[in-house]
Regions:
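Short active-site segment of divalent metal-dependent hydrolases/proteases
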Residues: 23-24, 173, 231
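A glycine-rich helix N-cap at a beta->alpha junction
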Residues: 64-78
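Conserved beta-strand segments of alpha/beta enzyme cores
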Residues: 46, 71-73, 92
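Metal-dependent phosphodiesterase/nuclease catalytic metal-binding core
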Residues: 78-226
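Active-site metal-binding motif and surrounding structural segment of the metallo-beta-lactamase
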Residues: 1-48, 76-78
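Phosphate- and divalent-cation-binding pockets in alpha/beta enzyme and binding domains
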Residues: 2, 28, 56-57, 176
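Short internal beta-strands
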Residues: 45-52, 223-225
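A conserved acidic, glycine/proline-rich C-terminal tail/linker
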Residues: 226, 230-232
Length: 232
């Protein structure tokens, strides 16, 4: 449903990241994998999840996914280590150990820096051929037919700053967590309880909204997104 609401095509999904093996975070996985198969997926899909899930994942795939036309691979994650577990041409995904009732980690998604934007008006003004665009985006100056050197900074505008998203799923308050998520563009931090239930949050390894705000403030994040509210 969220894919369709966001107008994101299912074919854009290349990897799935699961923080821990509580039902509200993983029960929908097999249904999603089945849906992808029925929609005609053929490209490989990787699932990153706590390593203890690997035997069950293989059993579920063998039992439920026999007719699927695409490959599903689980990548076991060590939830006790902070490390980069995924990287492609545009982003990295890093784990952050959390404290919950069973092995659990958060994820930080970081965009890689991109090249600057070409100033189309200046390209047209100086008559620069299309074949030179990539060189200019990579920092080259342009020398015109009269030998005049046009500096690169006249031909480009700065690239958009890389964005980052930290997903800190179920966890008790970790005082130094802010150091792990420092400066991210958007921080999602669970906030199961209100501050008057801080003792309860500690018992059940969850956080309060105030504690989430403390992490965000100390980390200097751009925005804080709260979630995982208790029905109480």
């Amino acid at each position: 449903m969220q894919f369709r609401r966001s107008h994101i095509h299912f074919s854009k999904l290349n990897a799935i990241f699961i923080s821990h093996m509580h039902g509200d975070h993983c029960f929908g996985l097999m249904g999603l994998l089945s849906t992808l198969g029925m929609l005609g997926r053929t490209s490989k899909l990787r699932v990153y999840a706590p390593k203890d899930y690997e035997p069950l994942f293989k059993q579920q795939v063998e039992y439920f996914m026999q007719t699927m036309e695409y490959e599903m691979e689980m990548i076991p994650v060590d939830t006790e280590k902070q490390q980069i577990i995924y990287e492609d041409h545009s982003l990295t995904v890093e784990t952050v150990p959390l404290k919950h009732r069973l092995p659990c980690c958060g994820f930080i998604f970081r965009e890689k820096p991109t090249l600057p934007h070409i100033r189309r008006d200046m390209i047209d003004y100086y008559g620069i051929p299309i074949s030179q665009i990539n060189n200019i985006k990579n920092g080259a100056d342009w020398t015109n037919g009269e030998g005049e050197v046009i500096p690169n900074e006249k031909l480009v505008t700065p690239a958009d700053p890389p964005r980052s998203y930290a997903y800190m799923s179920d966890t008790r308050y970790i005082p130094n967590l802010w150091e792990k998520v420092k400066g991210v563009t958007l921080l999602y931090h669970e906030s199961t309880y209100t501050s008057d239930q801080e003792d309860r949050a500690k018992i059940y390894n969850h956080s309060t909204a105030r504690q989430a705000a403390m992490v965000a403030r100390n980390a200097g994040v751009g925005k804080l997104l709260l979630g995982h509210y208790s029905a109480r």
